Amino acid sequence: MTPIQKTATVGGKEVLLETGKVAKQAHGSVWVRLGDSIVLVTAVSAAEKKEGIDFFPLTVDYQEKLFAAGRVPGSFFRREGRPTEKETLTSRLVDRSCRPLFAEGYSNETQVIATVISFDQENDTDVLALTGASAALHISDIPFGGPIAGVRVARVGGQLVANPTLAQRADADLDVVMAASRDAIVMVEGGAQEVSEAVMIEALLFGQAAVQPLLDAQDALRAATGNKPRRAFDPPKNDVELRAKVKALTWEKVKEAYGRDEKHDRYGRLSEIKKELLQALKEEAAGDAAKLATIALREKEIKGYYEDVKYDYMRKMITDERRRIGGRGMADIRKITCEVGLLPRVHGSSLFTRGETQALVATTLGTAEDEQRVEMLTGMVFKKFMLHYNFPPFSVGEVKFLRSPGRREIGHGALAERALRAVMPPEDQFPYTVRVVSDIMESNGSSSMASVCGGCLSLMDAGVPIKAPVAGIAMGLIKEGEKIAILSDILGDEDHLGDMDFKVCGTAAGITSIQMDIKIGGVTREILEQALSQAAEGRKHILGEMAKALSAPRGSISAYAPRITTIKIRPERIKDIIGPGGKTIKDITARTGTSINIEDDGSVSIASPNQDKVEEAIKMIRGLTQEAEVGRIYMGTVRKIAEFGAFVEIFPGTDGLIHISELSDKRVKSVSDVLSEGEEVMVKVISVDRSGKIRLSRKEALADSAKKSEGTEPPKGEPAK
């Protein structure tokens, strides 16, 4: 196959799509290039459907090869290891964007692999993977309803930029990744520095317009590869008569069940209705072996029709009756309770409860040694703020093995972390490494938003001087023709059966984090404006409830948290603190029980829960790094006697020479007539040459001391007064 190339211009830069050059045995293979960043994306789908499942078995893997940036992995085996957080989050971005677009009922295992094979340190590769995934699927025979395309939108200096460079992103106050089709925004993920709802909407619409050339390029690429027909598959069965019977047997019962407020009570009743449905159908067919056998064979189909009844009823209840599960109105938020400081030995803690969703959140303050070190294409990255989200099985009344965090947990944690990072104090004002852990105690929707609220309270309880409190809310959408309902603080059912999951986090002043997944086309600007406006009102209500527990950061950190003091020394004196083989710094930390971190610029951070120990360590460091000052008088110790003078240590590690002529104002025949080794002596620094050699004078020190009738002898190693 001859390689085929198509190009599109996005944000003034050319994006290249190429197929037919590599990975030709994949069902779809596209090479995406922006600048010198290149991502290879492949799509493959199994020939046969996977039996016994009720979901689409799609796997998306995004991987960054360190050779792409000319780097060798730092692991023991010098190979890439488990996926990084960036790889996991990008895999989720692609999955969330593409999954809703596959044909309903298609159940063949499908895998999309995006591999970064070149990185130019300017153009990020996540949006290339997103566009490449759509293109690879679009040119294949896999039943995919694309194309879509990905773009990053940033606001730099008040101007919106499509696919900004890494340098531009560093100066941006808004940074979102989004996927869009011809007529709809499909997915949004990003953060901001308290921007307004109007700015966010403009950014999203700007991004949707920016991807249109990429959609044209994908269509052109598909046409150039022969418009391969989509493969045939068995669509979902639709027995109109059986569907009507299922509805007749369950509609009123489902109506009663959805009137129950408590989640497990409601779920239990809905499960009972399903059993009653199957039993009723079997009783109706009693005595007819063929019909009974048919019911057994079609049980999965019958359950599917029952799920449709639940779907139809809940949506009708919302759009027609303007009533939600539990009787709430469209903008109503569940009851909120907040508690802080409930874990006595933890640096900061909170318990945030909203309806049947609850998060127990703890904050830990650490030192520079606790920073997370992450190897990325851009180099080694150090994270001083982390938020980890955990979703144990008991939170939803289930029994499962406890395993390491999955993609969902990592994604929810990243969303909450981004929401709070925007209000964290700068490092020079608060030099701590901060770890927030959110453990979900119970869940019925919006647990990630509970983590944001609980995380904020926990940070304030820990005394972290955040700029402003942050809250999060999950919004939903039900759209039936012209009937539209926008829901605040959605439940799990409303998320599952709705058309949009829109999470918005921020302060009273503006948005700090956003995540949106839309399952339908045609979400208009008006819908986005109403959703964001309703979210802002809900956010302010939640902030008010949080303020009842704690309205501002505590004035001091926990007694159990380390106290960190930072001092500055000359960089060339760093070696004096470290000592040969680290001997000196190890001695200081052992004697004081402190943790010491030294930066290349001479910043020295000393940490300990005991402030007295911090001061002790600072005194020792000052003693090692202080500089001799010309004209100052010191008490020193004679370390060596020579014919021409004496070497005196004026403070630890620093010696100077008293020439024999500077011992006394009288003639001295022998140095040993005046001084002896180990003797303490008052000396004055009379010069320091370019090489750092110090000249001392005993006679000038004595003369100066005699002139000061109120003078006192200075302590050893310190200037005289």
From Swiss-Prot:
Transmembrane residues, as ranges?
none
Q: Which reactions fall under this protein's catalytic activity?
A: RNA(n+1) + phosphate = RNA(n) + a ribonucleoside 5'-diphosphate
The annotated region (Disordered) lies at 699-721
- Give the UniProt family note: Belongs to the polyribonucleotide nucleotidyltransferase family.
Instruction: Specify the species.
Output: Anaeromyxobacter dehalogenans (strain 2CP-C)
Query: Binding residues for Mg(2+), per the UniProt record?
Result: D495, D501
One term of GO molecular function: polyribonucleotide nucleotidyltransferase activity
Extract the InterPro entries matched here. Answer: ExoRNase_PH_dom1, ExoRNase_PH_dom2, ExoRNase_PH_dom2_sf, KH_dom, KH_dom_type_1, KH_dom_type_1_sf, NA-bd_OB-fold, PNPase
Instruction: Identify the coding gene.
Output: pnp
Q: Which GO terms describe its cellular component?
A: cytosol
EC nos = 2.7.7.8
- Where does it live in the cell? Cytoplasm
What biological-process terms (Gene Ontology) are attached? mRNA catabolic process; RNA processing
**Keywords tagged on the record:** Cytoplasm, Magnesium, Metal-binding, Nucleotidyltransferase, RNA-binding, Transferase
Its main localization is cytoplasm
The answer on whether this UniProt entry bears the keyword Signal reads: no
Q: Where is the KH domain?
A: 562-621
Q: Relate the protein's function as given in its record.
A: Involved in mRNA degradation. Catalyzes the phosphorolysis of single-stranded polyribonucleotides processively in the 3'- to 5'-direction.
Protein name as annotated: Polyribonucleotide nucleotidyltransferase
Give the enzyme's main class according to its UniProt record, as a single word. transferase
Checking Pfam families in the record gives:
KH_1, PNPase, RNase_PH, RNase_PH_C, S1
Source superkingdom? Bacteria
